Amino acid sequence: MLKTESRDFLSRNLVLQTDSYKFTHWKQYPPGTQYVYSYLESRGGMFSQTVFFGLQYYLLKYLCGSVVTEEDVMEARDFVDRHIGPGMFNVEGWMHIVRNWGGRLPVVIKAVPEGSSVSVQNVLMTIENTDPACYWLTNYLETLLLKVWYPITVATLSHAIRKAILDKLHRSGDPALIDFKLHDFGYRGVSSEETAGIGAAAHLINFKGTDTVAGIRVLQEFYQSQEMEGFSIPAAEHSTITAW
């Protein structure tokens, strides 16, 4: 396989983007189960408020439109047969989605507005299947959807820092300067291009200073931003200075 072809292989089959144990959960629900309704909340921690952000990115990138094919289902079946054992994968369930829904996922996902601050122990997002034959699908998607923890965490922490800095500016500075008081230089400090993009985008909810280009691009591509959401300046580094 050429490098260019393998670049995005981990996200090219949605059926395999879940935890292994979920492959067998379709067998474990009580007979007659038709609908499963699940929700996401922040149980609490060091902050009393949670800033919700990042869901739209995951919906548009992974879940919207025709996202499952027969080829995906067969690949997943072969994988699970070897990974867990024959007969453990829900071939008919996934083929039902391919044949009857054109590869679209029969679920409804609702959420609070992105960027909003919500008290902990409140619902942030819900998901429910709309086809009674796909009761197993609701929590199958949990693995992917819970990745919102990262942009939520960045947005919440960044928001708390903004409040702390703003308090000090009111005491001994100029509150009008708050948007540029915490600059994001995190591009090189995270584990992937996707992490950089969604993390930096979350930070830009609260501040406007960033050198993480990926965050601006995420907002432009997945949030239809028409404005320049982040700003930087001409600046030097060691190599340009020590060269003299």
Locate predicted features.
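Low-complexity, highly charged intrinsically disordered N-terminal segments
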Residues: 36-90
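Glycine-rich, N-terminal phosphate-binding loop and its surrounding beta-alpha-beta segment
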Residues: 66-127
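Buried, small/hydrophobic-residue-enriched core segments of structured protein domains
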Residues: 4-47, 97-106, 115-119, 124-244
